[in-house]
Amino acid sequence: MTTPTIDEMRQNRLAYHFSGDCLRDGRPLPAIGEMLMHDGPIVWCEAGLYWSRKPHQALLYAPGPMLSLVRVGGTIIEPDYEDKGASTERTVLARIDATHLLRRFAADQALSVAHLWDMPEVVREYLTALDESKRDAARDAVRAAAWAARDAADAAARDATEAAARAVRDAAWADFDARVHAVLPAREHFQ
């Protein structure tokens, strides 16, 4: 199956919407085929039925893992510079619980950069199998690695700062010594 283009999504008035177990206003999720209607004007970021043309854009506003394919209608506002749109009508065409899909995607992204760091084996095992029994151990290992990296970076920054301070101090004293020697007679005259 090919991913529809934005133009195809617009032409067919299709979009995506994430939700939790209920809508943000507390109402239950609409059944498949049910149309939600917003009465009143759309007020950007305040009032209206929101959606995005791409699932990853909708994810930015996700209060939960329920992903719906929706058809939008009525009054539609979709600024070119935004990653979302708003309408006065939104009908759910299909819905999935995307929890596993989101976790698998996140794990695959983490595995794709595993070569960039010394990934603990328990983390690799968790990311590969998504075995919940290894989740806490993987989290602890990642935290320990992150703290160790932070400590190493702090130590390197501290060492660099101290070396720079020593260099500045040494240069300043060398300059002072040169000035003193410029105005006092040479040492050999006092021996």
Q: Where in the sequence are the language-model features?
A:
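Short, glycine-biased loop/turn motifs at secondary-structure junctions and
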Residues: M1-Q191
